[in-house]
Swiss-Prot record:
Key word Chaperone present: yes
Originating species: Lodderomyces elongisporus (strain ATCC 11503 / CBS 2605 / JCM 1781 / NBRC 1676 / NRRL YB-4239) (Yeast)
Subunit structure: Interacts with RIP1.
Function: Assembly factor required for Rieske Fe-S protein RIP1 incorporation into the cytochrome b-c1 (CIII) complex. Functions as a chaperone, binding to this subunit within the mitochondrial matrix and stabilizing it prior to its translocation and insertion into the late CIII dimeric intermediate within the mitochondrial inner membrane. Modulates the mitochondrial matrix zinc pool.
Any GO MF annotation of the entry: protein folding chaperone
GO annotation, cellular component aspect: mitochondrial matrix
Keywords: Chaperone, Mitochondrion, Transit peptide
GO biological process: mitochondrial respiratory chain complex III assembly
Localization: Mitochondrion matrix
Origin organism lineage: Eukaryota, Fungi, Dikarya, Ascomycota, Saccharomycotina
Gene: MZM1
Name of protein: Mitochondrial zinc maintenance protein 1, mitochondrial
Family of this protein: Belongs to the complex I LYR family. MZM1 subfamily.
Length: 117
């Protein structure tokens, strides 16, 4: 994959994930641009390939895992799922907490989400 294609894919992923949130959309685009500019001096093909691979992985993560939430008047969040979000299955419910680990990476802490209506 070329750097140009990886950059375009990153911009597409950001546009999908942050389509209704202009401040976050602008900040995400700026972050991608600054990442590209910081890697512009890379000359070794291995380094360039690694940077392109990393950008592609970030794009896939954003596109498939990032969901925007909007705080409602009742204090709950409305999650704006788009068609490319990976919803997964309920097989992990059968696992114990020890087998699953932690979503936040911190052992013993849990993440609570309010129900969406």
């Amino acid at each position: 994959m070329s750097a140009k294609l990886a950059y375009r894919n990153a911009l597409k992923a950001i546009n999908i994930a942050f389509k209704n949130d202009q401040p976050m959309l602008g900040a995400a685009k700026q972050q991608i641009r600054s990442g590209i500019m910081s890697n512009a001096q890379l000359t070794k093909p291995e380094e360039v390939a690694e940077a392109v691979k990393k950008l592609d992985e970030v794009s896939k993560f954003i596109r498939h895992n990032l969901v925007q939430g909007k705080l409602q008047e009742d204090g709950r969040y409305f999650l704006d799922f788009h068609k490319e979000i990976e919803l997964g299955d309920n097989e992990t419910i059968k696992n114990s907490k020890a087998e699953m680990g932690s979503l936040s990476g911190a052992k013993g802490k849990s993440i609570r989400v309010a129900k969406c209506s």
